[in-house]
Structures are given as C-alpha cells and as structure tokens.
C-alpha cells in the first residue's frame, strides 16, 4: 500500500497505555493488522507508507521478540529504522534519561519506541522530546503492544474476544503483560480470570475486576484461552515460590489439566518461555492448542499497524 492510498482516523500521536484506547481505536488497529498479516504471508511484504520517516528503537532492557518485531515492522513499512545500543551509550555511563532524551530528539527521529525498567519512562519521553512515542514495556506498568497482539491473535480464531473466558496464570505481580492484557480485555468485554500463588499477586488485585484463583484446576474450568506467564526473577528480591518444580506442580500448564477447560481452549505465552516451569513442552508445541508462534507472527502485523497509524498522524501534522 502506498502513502496516497492510506487513510484512517486514528486520533493518537502516542501509544503509552491501553487505557488511552477505545473499542473503535482497537478495531482500527486490528483491521490494519489483519491487512498486514495477510501481506506478510506473500513474497511482496513491503510498502512505502513510512518512507521518509525514522523509527528509533530505544531499548534499555533486553529484548528479542519485541525489538526484532518493531524493527521488522518499521522496515516493512519503508521507514528508516535505527536500533539504539543502550549498553554502549552514554546512558550506561550515568547519563540521565532527560539528557538522553534531549540528545536523541536533537537527531530528529519521528517515532521513538521505548522499553525501560522505570514505570512512566515512555510518558516522560513523550512529554519532553516532542516525538511520537510507543511504549514497548515500562517496568511492571504496561506493555500495550503485547496486549494488542494477544487479543488480535485470539480474534483471528474467534472474531471477537467479547464474552470469552480468559485465564492468566503465573507471575501476575511483576507482569506488565498481565496489566495491559487485563486492561485491554476489560475494554473488549472478556471475562478475565487470574491464577497465582498469593505471593505472586498484587495486593490490590481485588480491585482489578477479575476473578482470582489459587487453584489452577478450578481456574481452568470452562476457559476459552489460557495465558502462561514466566516468573520474572530479574524483578524479584526474594523467594516468591519454593522452587520451580513446586511451581510447575501447582501452576504449570499440561494437556491433562486442560481437560476441564473448553474443548477448543487456546494456549498462549508472551515469551520468553521456561519449558517445564510454567508450561509443559509438549503443550507449548501442540499445533492444536498452542498459538504461541501465532502471537509472534501477529506481533509484527500489529506493530506495523501501530507505526503506520501514528506515522499517518505525523504526516497530517506536518502538512497542516
């Protein structure tokens, strides 16, 4: 698709939180993502929608799927994509986020994709750089593009997630993926269940509008989809579970456990995946149940949609 052919009314310059989106915004993203998903399965994957724009990937935390997905998304849309190596930057020498932001903004990129360990870092950059900012994960706060690709993946199977019963199991406490998914699924009208040991649930979880379980077999009953989350040991300062073996015994997903779920239950994982801890390897690789690789494929398409829509707004501003 060329720039001249693209026209969608998406009223956002940034994507910082799923709370900024309404059902119409989400539908627009999903429509564009479906287009890109189909195009990405053909030999001719590229367009010039973002030609002349620069996307800066600024990842202060390690990433494989998300950074690679954003890089591929930008390049397939014709953008110039720059991956900023934070480990070799002045930020690693003690430079403040504010100074890093001003320095990068002076280079005149158009869209900044940011992952940072500090909650609110993408919002800070949006407020202080004048650039369009996409949140690729900030601390334990949010990961909006992951939530969008997760619901998009499910919508490809069901048409809509509204009214579906979806379980998230694992380390809810430290998970920005869980927080963004809960926010988005609530907007879309899904029934959300959470399952974890008490030590891996936030103290205010009773205010999240979800049904909370500590027994996985009870939580799985009648579920249409279940998402396993890894233990985020890099954010843990103590022992939250006795051992990985005990965690798998109580909360690990297996084929046997899924027998109480919906007959067509789908299994998800945002990655990185610890086989034999939160999910059995046979279940993770089961093409009848697992949509984990579909999530990865959807990630490129959804991020293409987001960059495309934000890029269109940047061009509108420039021509106004």
Curated annotation (Swiss-Prot):
Chain residues that bind carbamoyl phosphate: 65-66, 115, 143, 146, 271-272
Keywords on record: Pyrimidine biosynthesis, Transferase
SUPFAM superfamilies: Aspartate/ornithine carbamoyltransferase (SSF53671)
Pfam family, one: OTCace
Residues annotated for L-aspartate binding in this entry: 93, 176, 230
GO molecular function, one term: amino acid binding
InterPro entries the record matches: Asp/Orn_carbamoyltranf_P-bd, Asp/Orn_carbamoylTrfase, Asp/Orn_carbamoylTrfase_sf, Asp_carbamoyltransf, Asp_carbamoyltransf_Asp/Orn-bd
Reaction catalyzed: carbamoyl phosphate + L-aspartate = N-carbamoyl-L-aspartate + phosphate + H(+)
Pathway(s) per entry: Pyrimidine metabolism; UMP biosynthesis via de novo pathway; (S)-dihydroorotate from bicarbonate: step 2/3
GO BP annotation list: 'de novo' pyrimidine nucleobase biosynthetic process; 'de novo' UMP biosynthetic process; amino acid metabolic process
Enzyme Commission number, as recorded: 2.1.3.2
GO cellular component, one term: cytosol
Keyword Transferase annotated: yes
Subunit structure: Heterododecamer (2C3:3R2) of six catalytic PyrB chains organized as two trimers (C3), and six regulatory PyrI chains organized as three dimers (R2).
Function: Catalyzes the condensation of carbamoyl phosphate and aspartate to form carbamoyl aspartate and inorganic phosphate, the committed step in the de novo pyrimidine nucleotide biosynthesis pathway.
Family: Belongs to the aspartate/ornithine carbamoyltransferase superfamily. ATCase family.
Name of this chain's protein: Aspartate carbamoyltransferase catalytic subunit
Organism: Maricaulis maris (strain MCS10)
Gene: pyrB
């Amino acid at each position: 698709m060329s720039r001249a052919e693209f026209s969608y009314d998406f009223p956002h310059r940034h994507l910082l939180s799923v709370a900024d989106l309404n059902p119409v915004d989400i539908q627009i993203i999903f429509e564009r993502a479906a287009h890109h998903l189909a195009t990405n399965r053909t030999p001719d994957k590229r367009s010039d929608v973002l030609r002349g724009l620069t996307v800066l990937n600024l990842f202060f935390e390690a990433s494989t799927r998300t950074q690679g997905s954003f890089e591929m998304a930008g390049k397939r849309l014709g953008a110039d994509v720059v991956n900023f190596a934070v480990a070799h930057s002045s930020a690693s020498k003690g430079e403040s986020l504010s100074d890093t932001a001003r320095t990068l903004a002076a280079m005149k990129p158009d869209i900044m994709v940011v992952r940072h360990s500090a909650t609110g870092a993408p919002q800070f950059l949006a407020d202080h750089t004048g650039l369009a900012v996409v949140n690729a994960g900030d601390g334990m706060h949010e990961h909006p593009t992951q939530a969008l690709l997760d619901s998009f993946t499910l919508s490809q199977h069901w048409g809509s997630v509204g009214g579906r019963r979806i379980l998230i199991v694992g380390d809810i406490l430290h998970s920005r993926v869980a927080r963004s998914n809960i926010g988005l699924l609530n907007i879309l009208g899904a029934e959300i269940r959470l399952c974890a040991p008490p030590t891996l649930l936030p103290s205010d979880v009773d205010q999240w509008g979800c049904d909370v379980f500590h027994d996985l077999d009870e939580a799985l009953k009648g579920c249409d989809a279940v998402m396993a989350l890894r233990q985020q040991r890099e954010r843990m300062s103590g022992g939250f579970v006795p051992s990985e073996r005990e965690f798998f015994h109580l909360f690990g997903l297996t084929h046997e456990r899924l027998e109480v779920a919906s007959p067509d239950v789908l299994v998800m994982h945002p990655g990185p995946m610890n086989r034999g801890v939160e999910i059995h390897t046979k279940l993770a690789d089961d093409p009848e149940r697992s949509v984990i690789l579909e999530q990865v494929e959807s990630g490129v398409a959804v991020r293409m949609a987001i960059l495309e829509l934000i890029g269109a707004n940047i061009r509108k501003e420039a021509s106004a």
